[in-house]
């Protein structure tokens, strides 16, 4: 609890400080610090039914909902060379992307799809030849639908073997050029969103959470989370035994982490905040770094929380070379005085017994303290492991309506100013955390270009580049944030006050 109160003090120091006005430049970051941007396969590639690719969980869920889909998306499958040129223009060190399991091994196991294999080899070679480091995510909510149909996907222990075999193919075929691997993207959100809330693939849940067609919110998130941890450990072990000596890469695991702070300075809210941290972060980081689940979860969830055998605990502990942090905003946490009933089928939030209240910067205000809170918490609670910020950004609305044809907002680029302010503030916040001892080694903007967003379709965009999704050629155009990021990565000092924003707009006014 003392740590939470200390983090609350950080919040008080920075929450009302306004925009980050410190002057800093790229040279202030440690040698080897990586700046990049990211995408994911289903959101960027398109070509959903081309060259042997078969449906994944994403395809199934998105086609069942009226919010668009990734059938074409950004058409990165055909336009990757043009996109790499844009990365060079933006001065990126690295590009984070995911491999589509259903493109590489369409049936989940068995023969490798040679056309899919060649696509990823071509993409990686294009990146490397232009001096851009590939950072690969193996799993972004998208195992082949065939495995879900056959045995229930991550609800079944069989998934561990199939995922390890798939990862082995990736290491064997791409590992000579890939040094940073993330096994699972946002494991906590995949487990909660897909098996408690039903909002993300595979869309499973039960009352009292929601009323999906199938699922059990009281137990499935924990089964899935457990199997994800065992699969990660299996993949990490495979890499270290077969490939690490030759390839020299690192294996990480990513989580969505909010900047949690107590709503008040009361002990009850501080305790609730620690409980929320245990459920959201400790659920995965404690096994990865210490070998077992938080005591808070074991006491509350009881027999519904799977148990690691002694051998499994040893395998999971220390299997993570770095922690991938996906962070967007903060949330205040309030203790629930009248505890909900845990009888029947309680969902994830009933177990946690907290109220997140209103996210303090849900509208993505410039509050870099939220990032600092996250990094300080990881440093203090988990032994300061190496960290990469794998996603962090602010969205802009890019379409006036969803539909066909869609009408793009003509003022989108000019409306990117709040996003520039956000990036400036958060990148500066990372620097403050590094100076305070955090072992943070990289920052990836989400996303390199506007993508198909699972919860927002094509209505919102996180990209440095806008994409005209009503254009068959999917024309890309830089936003003001792309120019700012490029200037920063070229070594220009970052300073944003009202005059600095005017100068930035004036500098690139002819480009819009």
Swiss-Prot record:
Assigned keywords, A-Z: Disulfide bond, Glycoprotein, Glycosidase, Hydrolase, Signal
Glycosylation sites: 211, 216, 436, 468
Disulphides: 205-212
Pfam families: Glyco_hydro_1
Active site per UniProt: 186, 391
Similarity annotation: Belongs to the glycosyl hydrolase 1 family.
Entry protein name: Beta-glucosidase 4
Native source organism of the sequence: Arabidopsis thaliana (Mouse-ear cress)
Classification lineage: Eukaryota, Viridiplantae, Streptophyta, Embryophyta, Tracheophyta
Gene name of the record: BGLU4
């Amino acid at each position: 609890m003392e740590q939470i109160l200390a983090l609350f003090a950080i919040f008080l120091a920075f929450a009302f400080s306004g925009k980050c006005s410190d002057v800093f430049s790229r040279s202030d970051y440690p040698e080897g610090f990586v700046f990049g941007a990211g995408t994911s396969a289903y959101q960027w590639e398109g070509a959903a039914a081309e060259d042997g690719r078969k449906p994944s969980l994403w395809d199934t869920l998105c086609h069942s909902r009226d919010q668009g889909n990734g059938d074409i998306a950004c058409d990165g499958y055909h336009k990757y060379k043009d996109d790499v040129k844009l990365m060079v223009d933006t001065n990126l060190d690295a590009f984070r992307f995911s491999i589509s399991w259903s493109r590489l091994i369409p049936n989940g196991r068995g023969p490798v799809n040679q056309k899919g294999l060649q696509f990823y080899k071509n993409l990686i070679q294009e990146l490397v030849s232009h001096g851009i480091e590939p950072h690969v995510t193996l799993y972004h909510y998208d195992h082949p639908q065939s495995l879900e149909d056959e045995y229930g996907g991550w609800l079944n222990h069989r998934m561990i073997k199939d995922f390890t075999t798939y990862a082995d193919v990736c290491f064997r075929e791409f590992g000579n050029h890939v040094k940073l691997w993330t096994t699972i993207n946002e494991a906590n959100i995949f487990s909660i969103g897909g098996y408690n809330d039903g909002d993300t693939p595979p869309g499973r849940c039960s009352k009292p959470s929601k009323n999906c067609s199938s699922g059990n919110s009281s137990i499935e998130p924990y089964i899935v989370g457990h199997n994800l941890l065992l699969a990660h450990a299996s993949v990490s072990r495979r890499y270290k035994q077969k490939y690490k000596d030759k390839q020299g890469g690192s294996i990480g695991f990513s989580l969505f982490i909010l900047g949690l702070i107590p709503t008040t300075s009361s002990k009850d809210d501080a305790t609730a905040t620690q409980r929320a941290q245990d459920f959201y972060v400790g659920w995965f980081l404690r096994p990865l770094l210490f070998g077992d689940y938080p005591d808070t979860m074991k006491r509350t969830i009881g027999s519904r929380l799977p148990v690691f055998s002694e051998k499994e605990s040893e395998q999971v502990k220390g299997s993570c070379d770095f922690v991938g942090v996906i962070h967007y905003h903060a949330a205040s946490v309030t203790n629930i005085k009248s505890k909900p009933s845990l009888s029947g089928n309680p969902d994830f939030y009933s177990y946690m017994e907290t109220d997140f209240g209103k996210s303090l910067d849900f509208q993505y205000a410039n509050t870099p303290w939220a990032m600092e809170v996250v990094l300080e918490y990881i440093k203090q609670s988990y032994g300061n492991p190496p960290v990469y910020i794998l996603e962090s950004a602010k969205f802009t609305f890019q379409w006036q309506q969803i539909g066909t044809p869609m009408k793009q907002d003509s003022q989108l680029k000019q409306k990117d100013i709040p996003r520039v302010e956000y990036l400036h503030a958060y990148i500066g916040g990372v620097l403050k955390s590094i100076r305070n001892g955090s072992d943070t080694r990289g920052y990836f903007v989400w996303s390199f270009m506007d993508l198909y967003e699972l919860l927002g379709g094509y209505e919102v965009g996180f990209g440095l580049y806008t994409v005209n999704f009503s254009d068959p050629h999917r024309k890309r155009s830089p936003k003001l944030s792309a120019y700012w990021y490029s200037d920063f990565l070229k070594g220009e000092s970052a300073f944003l006050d009202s005059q600095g924003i005017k100068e930035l707009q004036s500098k690139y006014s002819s480009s819009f």
